[in-house]
């Protein structure tokens, strides 16, 4: 298959918004969540249902600033919500431990590599 520069005009650069929106649960309350994910969800009119972070105070602050109804005190409660999309934005060192706990058939978005090196991943 060959690619021609003229083909660029046929590339889809915008996709339609979903007709039904699932609840979003965020794992991690660091800078990328505060500065990028939450503003993007707000712009797309997505409601974030809940947030969890090892540092509960960070999750509470994000919840207050972005009108998030649920702050989970433990990871299992967040992961076991039904009919959700998981947004996982944690450091690579802990990502794999979280991924192993995700229920089967879950929809999730991962933000980091699954390890600190190729060997770990």
Language-model region placement:
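Beta-loop-alpha module in the N-terminal Rossmann-like domain of NAD(P)-dependent dehydrogenases
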Residues: 66, 70-121
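N-terminal Rossmann-like dinucleotide-binding module
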Residues: 2-66
């Amino acid at each position: 298959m060959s690619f021609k520069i003229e083909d660029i005009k046929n590339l889809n650069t915008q996709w339609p918004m979903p007709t039904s929106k699932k609840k979003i649960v965020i794992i991690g309350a660091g800078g990328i969540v505060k500065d990028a994910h939450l503003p993007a969800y707000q712009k797309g009119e997505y409601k974030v249902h809940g947030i969890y972070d090892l540092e509960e105070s960070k999750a509470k602050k994000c919840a207050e600033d972005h009108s998030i109804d649920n702050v989970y005190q433990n990871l299992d409660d967040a992961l076991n919500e039904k009919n959700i999309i998981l947004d996982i934005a944690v450091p690579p060192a802990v990502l794999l431990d979280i991924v192993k706990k995700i229920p089967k058939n879950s929809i999730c978005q991962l933000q980091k590599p699954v390890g600190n090196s190729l060997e770990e991943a």
